[in-house]
């Protein structure tokens, strides 16, 4: 959570610096700020606004503003895609990219040579983890599988899942996120990619940025100010700020829920009044933002914290969150020591491993966290039988639950074990293809790759039909069976 907030702090600072030139703003600031800390000043200003917005608004306002902000973001995404398509013809794309760029296939190495077209990009890619593409994809796939097995991340994603009325609604909400978000997101991303091609190929952008030693992470706001008309630029800026506010608000709003409910009320002040809980939530929100802001001052760039979050921190927490669903013996001590060992190892790795290699150390982090989980689990007794049986009946999980399943069936003969593992794994495979198509379709649409667009749309339609019969219909049927079971055994 702190890592994500630091990521947003650095990003919003660099982004807004382009739109609000320091030469103009500095006239109204009563103190001198070194040039290298100007993005941090902007970051502090906008995160402070967002923090008060979260504290004063609460959960309901965050939900409704999320809806409004998404609509703004969708319009902005469509606009930027249209602008990019009007400025860059398909022939220009083919002239700009090197051989092999259009192919989805690759070997152990990426083998795409940008040296003749954009030598500075070749130098930048040497510092990224993508050269050994085969290993990178294997590590990313391995991490993705375990992240999926871990269920919703223990942040605002979990809050949104738990706020749904039923398992069916939770599943539909989770699935609809891909449909709603991916298409406008990648329309905007590919629109900016086309504008970048125009910038580098037609407007001599490489020479301009090299001459003034421009940070490549600020290309996006440069493109907006250079190619987007004034009125639309305002809309786009509002859309991107909306995306920041939405993510920032949801992340900050999750922190008080965990700290106040799981620590303050449980161990410090169980009888706290509602007013006291609200004040504690305000304090936690401010502390989380302050700590993440301080962390942001020690980061070199956005990519640095991004690589650490997706490669190291995720690797540190995944093991504990996988085991909590799939192993009956797992307990609170195992979760604590697994999370602690994983996060501590991730922090150590932050200072000992180059950022470009973090993802390759995912198995190491996962192994350290897994050992912490197992040692912590056997250092304490298992959860009480009532809790385990109740969890098994309500969740019906996969994995190593045989002793608990036997007790649940003995107590409630109507209960049956989850025997749909093969069907669910088939749905996972189809779902991966379906979600990839949702990503690829807007990309092919913007670059006008007719063959790829037709193929991906057809594949999207086929996988949607398959999921209707193998996922949605069983979901509806099993929802009714679940409700009837809960009534029969008196757990409704």
Go through each PLM region and give its residues.
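Loop-to-helix junctions at membrane interfaces in multi-pass transport proteins
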Residues: 23-41, 71-234, 384-406
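Membrane-water interface regions at transmembrane-helix termini and the short interhelical loops
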Residues: 14, 18, 48-70, 160-166, ...
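Central hydrophobic cores of alpha-helical transmembrane segments
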Residues: 73, 77, 334-345, 390-392, ...
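Loop-to-transmembrane helix boundary motifs in multi-pass membrane proteins
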Residues: 1, 32, 36-44, 260-300
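Hydrophobic alpha-helical segments embedded in the membrane of multi-pass proteins
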Residues: 44, 48, 309-322, 340, ...
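Transmembrane helix-loop junctions in multi-pass membrane proteins
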Residues: 4-25, 53-60, 191, 199-201, ...
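Helix-loop-helix module between adjacent transmembrane segments
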Residues: 1-55, 125, 140-150, 242-250
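Terminal cytosolic tails of multi-pass membrane transporters
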Residues: 100-102, 164, 354-492
